[in-house]
Amino acid sequence: MELNPTEKDKLLIFTAGLVAERRKARGLKLNYPEAVAFISAALLEGARDGMTVSELMHFGTTLLKREDVMDGVPEMIAEVQVEATFPDGSKLVTVHQPIV
């Protein structure tokens, strides 16, 4: 299987997001990279499901709560940005203050 660098990046995000999802399901608090991966993967999947950029920007703020992550993580993540593929091309999705 041949993958270009963008496809490899998306596969890595998905894999890290899946690990984070499983850890969250087991009741573990997510660390910084896990939280970013969890949010990023959900945004990519939301774009694939047909959500718009503005819908994703709101959706990204509903995924994790302060109780889901380790102490200090919400303050470390001021924003999450991911380049998602939409029917009309790739767009940058930015979620400000994703964990409240």
From Swiss-Prot:
Gene3D superfamilies xrefs: Urease, gamma-like subunit (3.30.280.10)
EC number(s) on file: 3.5.1.5
Pathway of action: Nitrogen metabolism; urea degradation; CO(2) and NH(3) from urea (urease route): step 1/1
Any Pfam family matching the protein: Urease_gamma
Disulfide bond annotation, renumbered to this chain: none
UniProt entry keywords in alphabetical sequence: Cytoplasm, Hydrolase
Cellular component GO terms held in the UniProt record: cytoplasm
Gene Ontology terms describing biological process: urea catabolic process
Transmembrane regions listed in the UniProt entry: none
Compartments where found: Cytoplasm
Catalytic activity field: urea + 2 H2O + H(+) = hydrogencarbonate + 2 NH4(+)
Alphabetized InterPro entries for the sequence: Urease_gamma, Urease_gamma/gamma-beta_su, Urease_gamma_sf, Urease_subunit
Top EC class of this enzyme: hydrolase
Keyword check for Membrane: no
GO MF: nickel cation binding; urease activity
Subunit and partners: Heterotrimer of UreA (gamma), UreB (beta) and UreC (alpha) subunits. Three heterotrimers associate to form the active enzyme.
Similarity comment: Belongs to the urease gamma subunit family.
Name of the protein this chain belongs to: Urease subunit gamma
Originating species: Acinetobacter baumannii (strain ATCC 17978 / DSM 105126 / CIP 53.77 / LMG 1025 / NCDC KC755 / 5377)
